[in-house]
A protein has these predicted regions:
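Charged catalytic cores and adjacent phosphate/nucleic-acid-binding surfaces used
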Residues: 1-143
Length: 143
């Protein structure tokens, strides 16, 4: 695999951060700006991960509504097994679990009737408990 600037990794390190640059040119400043804004998915054992909530990226603000749409696309790295579960949380409670056995996912979820106050978030879990992708939460707009 390669890093942000196209350099081949010297060692096999399964840890990665997927950072949303929002169309900015990859640079130290744009990466720091995105990380500070929380536009990140921390992952271990994944080749790809992308999660949105009502079209917003992780770390962003979303309008809390009666029905919210989450989209996830993810792929495990070679030799790291399959995606086994997707969990959706409202604040600190699991509100949906999707059990799977797939190397790649491209799925939509509609979440309704939740009573969360602060945020909604998702976790993508693999066979090995240490293989996980965790996006920054989607925070509810105030007011």
């Amino acid at each position: 695999s390669v890093d942000l600037f196209g350099f081949r990794r010297i060692i096999d390190n399964p840890a990665a951060n997927f950072i949303y640059l929002n169309g900015e040119t990859p640079s130290r400043d744009s990466v720091v700006k995105a990380v500070r804004a929380g536009h990140v998915i921390a992952a271990c054992g994944f080749d790809a991960a992308d999660v949105t909530c009502d079209g917003q990226i992780p770390g962003g603000e979303v309008r809390k509504s009666a029905s919210m749409k989450l989209h996830v696309t993810a792929a495990m790295a070679e030799n790291y097994g399959n995606i086994k579960e997707i969990r959706i949380y409202a604040d600190d409670r699991i509100i949906h679990r999707e059990l799977l056995d797939l190397n790649k996912v491209d799925m939509d979820f509609t979440v309704s009737g939740m009573d969360a106050r602060y945020f909604i978030r998702m976790e993508i879990a693999a066979e090995n408990e240490h293989r996980l992708a965790v996006p920054t939460p989607f925070y509810f707009q105030r007011g």
